[in-house]
Each structure stands twice: as C-alpha cells, then as structure tokens.
Amino acid sequence: MGFLSEYNAKLTSAETAVKCVKSGDWVEYTSNLGFPAACDLALSKRRDELKGVKIRGDLIFGPIQVIECDPEMEHFVYNTWHCSGYERKMCDKGRAFFEPMVFRNLAWYYKNFLTSDVCMVTVSGMDDD
C-alpha cells in the first residue's frame, strides 16, 4: 500500500474521530493555530452523552465549543496551560481553569505524572508526491 492509499484509508470525519472519547477521559488539544476546531465542535455535540471529560489546551483564541456548550462544567472541564485573552475571560468567569507550567518541564510532567486518553492534533494534508 502506498503512502497516499494508506493516508486516504485513515481519513475520517471529526464526528467519527471523537467517538473514542469516553466519560472521565483526559483529552489533549494542541495550542494556538493547531487547535482542533472541527473535533472541538464535534465533541461539544456529544455533551449529553459524556460526563467529566477533562481537556487541556493553551493559547487558544476561541471560542472553544466545549466551554461554550457547558457553562456548568458537568460534561467538559477545560484547563489551560497559558491563557489567551479568550481563555483568561473564561477563567475569570469560572468556566475554565488555569494550570501554570513551564514549557521546558512539559515532557517531564507527562513522563512522570500526567495521563492522557485522547490527543487531538490539527495537521496539514499530505503532499501529492
């Protein structure tokens, strides 16, 4: 199987991709422009199926749909490593949490005490070659 065939065989919709998220999972969002907007929207639509899903991201300019759809944070709890203006407003309103960290220690945190169940990453499409 060539790379392009393998790539095409693995393509899926955001709605299908987020079906792997279960209640209580830790979900990682990438930061800044890597924010997985399509998966965030698809996950927010599963709100009533899920409880206590914890999400980590940082410097996401917003809006973040899992925050917007669940003001009481019964279904989704969003945590940010570093606040964008939008995330700071959400933290100030009690709708998100700030988790201070030092970037150089992040790999150590995951190696020694953090766990993740799902990671959502925005990537570019493959080259035609």
Whereabouts are the PLM-identified features?
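Conserved alpha/beta enzyme-core scaffold
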Residues: 1-129
